[in-house]
UniProtKB/Swiss-Prot annotation:
Pathway terms, separated by semicolons: Pyrimidine metabolism; UMP biosynthesis via de novo pathway; UMP from orotate: step 1/2
EC number, UniProt record: 2.4.2.10
Superkingdom of origin: Bacteria
Free-text function comment from the UniProt entry: Catalyzes the transfer of a ribosyl phosphate group from 5-phosphoribose 1-diphosphate to orotate, leading to the formation of orotidine monophosphate (OMP).
Keyword tags: Glycosyltransferase, Magnesium, Pyrimidine biosynthesis, Transferase
Subunit: Homodimer.
Protein's name according to its UniProt entry: Orotate phosphoribosyltransferase
Record's keyword annotation contains Transferase: yes
Residues annotated for 5-phospho-alpha-D-ribose 1-diphosphate binding in this entry: R96, K100, H102, E122, D123, L124, I125, S126, T127, G128, G129, S130
Length: 209
């Protein structure tokens, strides 16, 4: 079983991911979605957490061997990033969504040196907007952002476009395609449900029609 499949299985088992193609969720953007993900739940399950953190370490070593600092996005990327940095014996920092409005007014907490090669950790990629904002903030502070590694992606076309335009490499440990395949195999969804989930990936607005 691949790492992507193992993680998809774990996310379903611990209910970090819910699939309701016949009774969709409403995202903050207003989009009706057949999937809801809360990867913060993974921190409460040691087996799942270890699988994810070890997957992060292996992926970073394979794709970004020159990394010098790990950064987590606030807030979801912070615990994962801190664990990864500890496992890799690397410095750690975290990136706020906006400048702090008191004290030193930092957006990056921790010490990042000019030109230091950084990998940013995120838990979930939808459109990628927030983590790309974090990458831009890190670059402004002088970091050399090598790429972003995340637990899971919805594989939305908008995300691919955004990362391409930003020139930032994205790697995820698991993905929507893998998850719905595992969900069907393990009986979480019906054939009709799988059909709707595939339609959502193709067209997030008209998938129910």
């Amino acid at each position: 079983m691949t790492l992507a499949s193992q993680i998809a299985t774990q996310l379903l088992d611990i209910k970090a991911v819910y699939l309701k193609p016949e009774d969709p969720f409403t995202w903050a953007s207003g989009i009706k979605s057949p999937i809801y993900t809360d990867n913060r739940v993974t921190l409460s399950y040691p087996k799942t957490r270890d699988l994810i953190e070890n997957g992060f370490v292996e992926t970073i070593r394979a794709h970004f061997p020159e990394v010098e600092v790990i950064a987590g996005t606030a807030t979801a990327g912070i615990p994962h990033g801190a664990i990864i940095a500890d496992k890799m014996t690397l410095p750690f920092a975290y990136i706020r969504s906006k400048l702090k409005d008191h004290g030193a007014g930092n957006q990056i907490e921790g010490r990042v040196l000019k030109g230091q090669k950084m990998v940013i950790i995120e838990d979930l990629i939808s459109t990628g907007g927030s983590v790309l904002d974090a990458a831009a903030a890190a670059s402004r502070e002088g970091a050399d952002v090598l790429g972003v590694v995340a637990i899971f992606t919805y594989e939305l076309p908008k995300a691919s476009q955004n990362f391409k335009e930003a020139g930032i490499k994205l790697i995820t440990l698991s993905n929507y395609t893998e998850l719905i395949a595992v969900a069907k195999l393990q009986g979480y969804i019906t054939n009709d449900g799988l059909h709707l989930l595939k339609k959502f990936k193709e067209d997030q607005v008209n998938w129910q029609q």
